[in-house]
From Swiss-Prot:
It holds the Pfam family DHDPS. The keyword Lyase applies. This is Probable 5-dehydro-4-deoxyglucarate dehydratase. It comes from Pseudomonas savastanoi pv. phaseolicola (strain 1448A / Race 6) (Pseudomonas syringae pv. phaseolicola (strain 1448A / Race 6)). Keywords: Lyase. GO terms for biological process: D-glucarate catabolic process.
């Protein structure tokens, strides 16, 4: 799949990022991950991101990363394109990017580098180095320490033909509008704020109709139904989903830092697809919080 074909796929439909399965000892659980992918693939997501943020990329060892990407690519070979999360220091990000390409990933989600503060020029050089190390398409994730400006994104687009997507995790509307207007159809644009459904209608109005769904991991039918309501501008249905599910969900998610990942794993367990515990420094939901989530999920009906 060439970068432009990937760009076309990412320009419509719902995207998601499966959680990564761990066993009770916290090690990668391949069989559980395969079962998860086989369950989710038929629901109709346009693409899945393996080892992304919700997949706990930040806690994976290099050897685990290879096994996770290979498992995802092999399992979904005939059903849905797999993009691989990459990130961290530049040389590490390049190694992961090249490994994901070797294993058959159709594209990459370039997550922010960690901890080190850097100038805009330095971040742009980091993105360019990763893009030029591979031939497959790359989506850059503006979030936390990665805050690329429209001017730098325009320069990167000129220098890196395989940079085909921009994912926004900042929620800076002025910046998002500026990037969308400046870059036009050069990129596919993805909404990437945590629990992106809450912002989906607003982002669609800005020209960003595509987003990645975390709740697809445990209420996939609801996630797809909500996406279709957004796509057809059914404001009444969208409002009902937000009132009945997403706002109560946020009340649980916002109880502790890091719960944006933990609550997804809790939901998967309640749905019958236990992915095991999160890895430190994240913490799992408490039993009471799991009960609250289970009650909320039960109200949504069979998935």
């Amino acid at each position: 799949m060439n970068p432009q074909e990937l760009k076309s796929i990412l320009s419509s439909g719902l995207l998601s990022f499966p959680v990564t399965d761990f066993n009770a000892q916290g090690d990668f659980h391949r069989a559980g991950y395969i079962k998860r992918l086989e369950w989710l693939a038929p629901y109709g997501a346009s693409a899945l991101f393996a080892a992304g943020g919700t997949g706990e990329f930040f806690s994976l060892a290099a050897s685990e990363y290879s096994e996770i990407i290979k498992t995802a690519v092999d399992t979904c070979a005939t059903s849905v394109p797999i993009l691989a999360g990459v990130g961290g220091p530049t040389r590490q990000a390049i190694e992961y990017a090249q490994e994901a390409e070797r294993l058959g990933a159709k594209g990459l989600l370039l997550l922010p580098h960690y901890l080190t503060e850097a100038s805009q020029d330095g971040v742009a050089a980091h993105v360019e180095a990763v893009c030029k190390a591979v031939k497959i398409g790359v989506v850059v994730y503006n979030r936390n320490v990665c805050r690329l400006t429209p001017t730098l994104l325009e320069q990167l687009a000129e220098r890196c033909p395989n940079l085909i997507g921009y994912k926004d995790g900042l929620g800076d509307i002025e910046l998002m509008v500026s990037i969308r207007r400046r870059l036009g159809d050069r990129f596919s644009y993805l909404g990437g704020l945590p629990t992106a459904e809450v912002y989906a209608a607003a982002y669609k109005a800005l020209g960003v109709p595509v987003y990645s769904s975390a709740v697809f991991n445990f209420v996939p039918k609801l996630a797809m139904d909500f996406y279709h309501a957004i796509a057809r501008d059914d404001h009444e249905a969208v409002g009902k989903y937000i009132d009945d599910f997403f706002l109560p969900y946020l009340e649980i998610r916002n109880r502790k830092a890091g719960y944006a990942v933990s609550i997804v794993k809790a939901g998967a367990k309640i749905a019958g697809y236990d992915a095991g515990p999160v890895r430190a420094p994240l913490t799992d939901l408490t039993p009471d919080e799991c009960d609250m989530l289970a009650a909320l999920m039960d109200k949504q009906g069979k998935q």
